[in-house]
């Protein structure tokens, strides 16, 4: 019996990871689509600020779960998640598996 429940939990975990990956790709797809549909003649790209505000609006206000551009290529903490509830100290600790993503997150924030 314990092995069956373990299999069920691992399949749910895998389904959650796949769902997160699909959600991230869908959000990025619609962001790029909206970016292509904006009339570029009305944006002053020389100032650089409008480009920054565009990125800030889509990636930090519409979907705050995406901290950087290349987020869809890595599912957040997918192999560091555990079935048991996390303790308070674990919740306070930021878990980043990839050192490159960690350095980018340190630069971004």
UniProtKB/Swiss-Prot annotation:
Q: Assign the protein's first listed, main location to one coarse class.
A: membrane
Cellular component terms per the entry's GO annotation:
membrane
Q: Where are the transmembrane segments?
A: 19-39, 53-73
Q: Which domain of life is it from?
A: Eukaryota
UniProt keyword list: Membrane, Transmembrane, Transmembrane helix
Location within or outside the cell = Membrane
List the membrane topology term(s). Answer: Multi-pass membrane protein
Q: Recite the other comments.
A: Located in promoter region of essential gene SEC31.
**UniProt protein name:** Putative uncharacterized protein YDL196W
The protein's organism comes out as Saccharomyces cerevisiae (strain ATCC 204508 / S288c)
């Amino acid at each position: 019996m314990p092995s069956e429940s373990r299999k069920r939990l691992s399949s749910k975990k895998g389904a959650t990871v796949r769902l997160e990956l699909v959600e991230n790709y869908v959000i990025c797809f619609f962001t790029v689509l909206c970016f292509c549909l904006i009339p570029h003649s009305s944006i002053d790209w020389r100032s650089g600020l409008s480009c920054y505000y565009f990125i800030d609006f889509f990636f930090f206000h519409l979907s705050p779960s995406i901290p950087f551009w290349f987020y869809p290529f890595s599912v957040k903490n997918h192999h560091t998640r555990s079935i048991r509830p996390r303790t308070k100290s674990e919740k306070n600790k930021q878990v980043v598996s990839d050192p490159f993503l960690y350095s980018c997150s340190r630069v971004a924030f």
